[in-house]
């Protein structure tokens, strides 16, 4: 096999090589049973054991309290934009939302289809380069919940703090930074994350929801979108995304073997400090995000002359530095440096950036 490339894709994203090797080894014959996980009944004892271990490993990694359910659902994070108000926003009620970029705006637009949304805060006045402090937010007195995205994958804007709301449930989209650093799950009413960034392959969304928020779905909520029904059926009301669930479980095992979320946080800090440090010291590359709001996972940057973008990407591709093109709505470059992207990948990227600057700067 040729050398594996360094994959900076925002999602579907890099997976740990050890996980891919194990999945490859088990692909045709899972633990001597003579069949693939893809061929197993989700009701079989073997698969139920896989699913239960994945959940327990995630609980261990995140220290999830016992009064929270962990759901492995379908539809991706985008389906949660509707599922959350259908389950948590009563008819005639209001939900607070914070706008920090494209993904939080999508969640706001979807929630407005189901009820009243109060825009509690927006990064728009800062051109989405900074996040206002909570003292400047316009919170509702009786919000059913407050929703925000902890990390904006496209814009590279990340909260480095957790809102304090008293009794109002805090709902957070952690699709691109879950498991990247330690958090206190008990501060949140509901956490959700699409799998294809820091958890596993696409086709799966993980929802961590506090027990007291179950059973509140509207009568119009489809059965498949009701959290309580999902919880009561062990995330298997219908056939789940079995292979994605299995692979995510392998990632959780790998994370535990690496030392857990605390070790990931140390590694991720080193990666982001190296990359941002190089960008800030350069007169050729720029990142406009306020320092206290810079994403650890998704680092957008621009070249001094956008006419050089194609040459930069071609050179990166030739060196096995893949998927650095920025999102079409933002332009420029973006390096996504999730848990599975090692420090060696960031070192290789910085070396190339220095070489390109020397040649074209």
Curated annotation (Swiss-Prot):
Its cofactor is pyridoxal 5'-phosphate. Gene3D superfamilies: Aspartate Aminotransferase, domain 1, Type I PLP-dependent aspartate aminotransferase-like (Major domain). Binds 1 pyridoxal phosphate per subunit. L-glutamate binds at residue 43. Its EC number is 2.6.1.52. The keyword Transferase applies. SUPFAM superfamilies: PLP-dependent transferases. The modification N6-(pyridoxal phosphate)lysine is found at residue 197. It catalyses: O-phospho-L-serine + 2-oxoglutarate = 3-phosphooxypyruvate + L-glutamate; 4-(phosphooxy)-L-threonine + 2-oxoglutarate = (R)-3-hydroxy-2-oxo-4-phosphooxybutanoate + L-glutamate. CDD domains: PSAT_like. InterPro entries: Aminotrans_V_dom, Pser_aminoTfrase, PyrdxlP-dep_Trfase, PyrdxlP-dep_Trfase_major, PyrdxlP-dep_Trfase_small. Keywords: Amino-acid biosynthesis, Aminotransferase, Cytoplasm, Pyridoxal phosphate, Pyridoxine biosynthesis, Serine biosynthesis, Transferase. Its main location: cytoplasm. One of its GO terms (molecular function) is O-phospho-L-serine:2-oxoglutarate aminotransferase activity. It is an enzyme of class 2 (transferase). HAMAP family: SerC_aminotrans_5. Belongs to the class-V pyridoxal-phosphate-dependent aminotransferase family. SerC subfamily. Catalyzes the reversible conversion of 3-phosphohydroxypyruvate to phosphoserine and of 3-hydroxy-2-oxo-4-phosphonooxybutanoate to phosphohydroxythreonine. This is Phosphoserine aminotransferase.
